[in-house]
């Protein structure tokens, strides 16, 4: 199925502006469920669902579509006691299939908009635009001139109707909105995915319907960031357009163009409130960083704005202390698995002119990133590779695998951790993590063969594990010429890492997935 064949569901009156029209009929197409189960559309932004049930065959999909044509299965009422409804916690598998198909159908317009936006701006389609490692070179370039940083945790208890209203601004397909409302209330009643908290309901992204709830969460974050970007765009003296190339920014500026005429006059008196040409905003998942060259008072104004915005727009009360304001030179913030801070180096230069001598103090600022060893040990502990204190233990559930497969799994994790944390200024911190994985691998092999670790290593030799735990520098030396490699022995940022994976979900059903790939 090609993308061009889907445009008929989205275009309106032959205009170039695409709307979310006629999405509901897509649920009756077999290829939608194929996209949800397989690799997405033409290798695009769709995420593969690794834990999808093997029962999702073409026969079941056809049976599901046949049942959906019988509209009585989709009718729901408060006193409905019919146990044969196609959607609900009593028929969880079909509910999961429909919710994933619904999420895919809602993602398709975003894909088409992204493609058209890149073509209009003549931006080549490249995976490098999606790399989260590209954030750190940006911070290295900008942070030396900034003063304050704010850690922001985006609030996520949100009322169900707010989610429906958010999507209502994007789509004119009433049937899809009714289906979305039905899904949310059905999951709430089953107490599986939405748990009640007065007066709102909390969405927890579950493994069973991860794609569906990830789409809803991204829609919510989209609205959270919209006015923030709008105010910054209006108040900035240097109007940068570079952020328009990012995936999450593409739709902001399309919506902003329609919103600008209405809001420009209304917010004209308050724009001076946020004037700051050196304000930078970076977000990954539910955590955001706001850095500024302005004063502490200006950062407090931004915090007040965000708190009131969440309160009046999303009906969510957030305590102001949820947003921390710190001086960048005296604070280390954790972001994307790195501990980052601003190092200040003092250099004394003595200058002499004729009979007079001068002593000049020179301050240089450098953005520094280090590995958060405690966080990595915590992740290894949750994945059952070590104890909470970092003592290696055997991976008992892998003892039924072959020796080569066990070593390959441990080596894969070790290499991917080294690959992701290659930007650390102190790579010696990773030695402890590699030691934990090596000893855990040896303990797992020894447990499988019912022998002691020392005796097992002496029998097979210490070189058994060396091939699978190569250092990142050794791999780079094989790729690049020796002269070029020596000049790049410092921090390295890779542009092929698009998300952070959890170690607990790194390998599912004996399938190994890279650490730098989405689940």
Curated annotation (Swiss-Prot):
HAMAP family on file: MatK
Protein name: Maturase K
Similarity annotation: Belongs to the intron maturase 2 family. MatK subfamily.
Main location: plastid
GO cellular component, one term: chloroplast
GO biological process: mRNA processing; RNA splicing; tRNA processing
Organism: Dioscorea elephantipes (Elephant's foot yam)
The entry's keywords: Chloroplast, mRNA processing, Plastid, RNA-binding, tRNA processing
GO MF, any single term: RNA binding
